[in-house]
């Protein structure tokens, strides 16, 4: 079973660690603050092909800390999103430690 750890930083964000490896960075107070470069690139692509604030349907393959779904919710409220995340332990820990915002349309599905 994977070990999940949450490491807080001095700015209020949290890095989600799985088996000692950083998986994602979440700032629940500022979901538009993206730390990992690959997430910044994905956000830039979404901005280029579907500018905010209009909602967009998104399917995410992998979720970890749900950083990108949180960003989509913050920048395009009402967007229906499905996250395919096989690690149910990770998902449960993230939901407990880093709750999703109210009125979100993010659905996480376990895909084995």
Description of each model-found segment:
Residues 23-27:
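Catalytic zinc-binding patch centered on the HExxH motif and its immediate surroundings
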Residues 10-11, 29-112:
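The AdoMet/dcAdoMet-binding core of the Class I SAM-like
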Residues 1-20:
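N-terminal auxiliary segments of SAM/dcSAM-dependent transferases
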């Amino acid at each position: 079973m994977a070990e999940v750890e949450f490491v807080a930083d001095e700015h209020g964000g949290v890095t989600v660690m799985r088996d000692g490896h950083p998986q994602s960075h979440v700032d629940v107070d500022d979901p538009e603050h993206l730390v990992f470069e690959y997430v910044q690139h994905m956000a830039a692509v979404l901005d280029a092909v579907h500018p905010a604030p209009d909602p967009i349907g998104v399917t995410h393959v992998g979720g970890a800390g749900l950083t990108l779904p949180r960003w989509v919710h913050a920048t395009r409220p009402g967007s229906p999103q499905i996250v395919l995340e096989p690690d149910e332990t990770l998902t449960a820990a993230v939901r407990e430690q880093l709750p999703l915002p109210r009125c979100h349309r993010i659905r996480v599905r376990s895909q084995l």
